């Protein structure tokens, strides 16, 4: 107390990053138990880095729909299912769609604090097996109340709270038209197809039973086909074509201290530079990445043009359009290999998948700084700046 000497935090490095290919709903991964899906990513990370798994201090795994096979601490169950040491604990995180980005934050913070040296940050979600929203609908069928109490209703009323309405409200407040959303969505598919054809994802994917290519991108989609889809509601701009796909997948990253890098002979891919998280309007729900990006850049003493690559989750096309307009970030540098509209959004896995994509894209291009941000249920967003090393 009273010391004028500031504590110097340790640095956290990403020493490994892998992901599964992303499966479509009822696609190639739909028959894989999510515990085994997560286990595959964890085992792939251990094999890729060559780390002694017993040296890992903790496993932090994001997962949104924690019911059925995704409950009972799937982080622990996936680690054990991978045949990895019982001595290593695991904890499961729910910050909605940003769950495994938050896992990266928690892992980095543990390393930066000096309390841990080697932490796995991961994410998993099987939306084919555990349907989106089932944690609420099944509970209500069993007689349990909705996850909004008296205080919530007194504050926000009984208006609809959903990601779909949030996306439409963004269109209305920012003035986006359906044609703009569809043009953005088409570009996402085209970028993803190009990335697949050029093999940009090959080194980051650990194939599962021969499945090693993202199956969401549509090669034959067009503005004409998108225009033929019905909107979610008659007077809305939002259609299925401009929303992220329901998907299955998993990802895992190894976060290490500088001492752990030396001790275990690890080669870092990136340094965790800056962490930020914000709350935002829970009714709009999806605008948090705007303020999270600003907060991360301000904390880092950087400007938007200092970032070489952005990974911004494409929950819906208007999320990216509003984010770009308000932050000044160019969409040319955002999601260069396609986003969730084309590749899919396996909820709790997406944060780890986006971070893996970001790390590898910086390695591929030689860029220095990357920023990842995601909108999250409840009106929240994480932002992470990493630096290639």
Model-derived segments and spans:
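Active-site-proximal alpha-helical scaffold in enzymes
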Residues: 95-125, 171-200, 252-259, 346-365, ...
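Active-site pocket-lining segment
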Residues: 168, 201, 211, 273-342
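Conserved beta-ketoacyl condensing-enzyme motif
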Residues: 30-118, 124-142, 205-215, 283, ...
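Condensing-enzyme catalytic core mediating Claisen C-C bond formation in acyl metabolism
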Residues: 2-34, 224-287, 291, 298, ...
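Short, well-ordered amphipathic alpha-helical segments that serve as non-catalytic structural scaffolds
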Residues: 34-50, 74-78, 103, 163-170, ...
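Flexible glycine-/small-residue-enriched beta->alpha junction loops
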Residues: 118-173
